[in-house]
């Protein structure tokens, strides 16, 4: 079965696993998904993200979720730009999430980064998702 939006699938898997209290979650490997997972790790929303060898020689990404006082650290994980409607922003229009308390993950010409780093670098790009 083909997947129309693999990034949305990844975000939904993370949301579902966090809402039921699972310690980790796995999904099929792609470089974009790995970059998003590493951004989440760097920003402190998850403990770890690693590539593991899955079944039939296909790689998977495993994320170890982070909880604080029994509640998931990731409260909001929302896909913004999707396959049917892409959302692009210049460096001046990059959105702030919850007044700067959350992050937006941006795909730029310099790689996948958070909104504040994109502003510092002076680049815009496709707004992939919001995290808070």
UniProtKB/Swiss-Prot annotation:
Keywords, comma-separated and alphabetical: Ribonucleoprotein, Ribosomal protein, RNA-binding, rRNA-binding
Annotated Gene3D superfamilies: 3.30.1370.30, 3.30.1490.10
InterPro entries tied to this protein: Ribosomal_uS8, Ribosomal_uS8_CS, Ribosomal_uS8_sf
HAMAP family: Ribosomal_uS8_B
Keyword RNA-binding among UniProt keywords: yes
Alphabetized PANTHER family for the sequence: 40S RIBOSOMAL PROTEIN S15A
Origin species: Xylella fastidiosa (strain 9a5c)
GO biological process, one term: translation
Function statement: One of the primary rRNA binding proteins, it binds directly to 16S rRNA central domain where it helps coordinate assembly of the platform of the 30S subunit.
Designated name of the protein: Small ribosomal subunit protein uS8
GO cellular component, one term: ribonucleoprotein complex
Gene Ontology molecular function, alphabetical: rRNA binding; structural constituent of ribosome
Family note: Belongs to the universal ribosomal protein uS8 family.
Pfam families referenced in this protein's UniProt entry, alphabetically: Ribosomal_S8 (PF00410)
Extent of the signal sequence: none
Subunit structure: Part of the 30S ribosomal subunit. Contacts proteins S5 and S12.
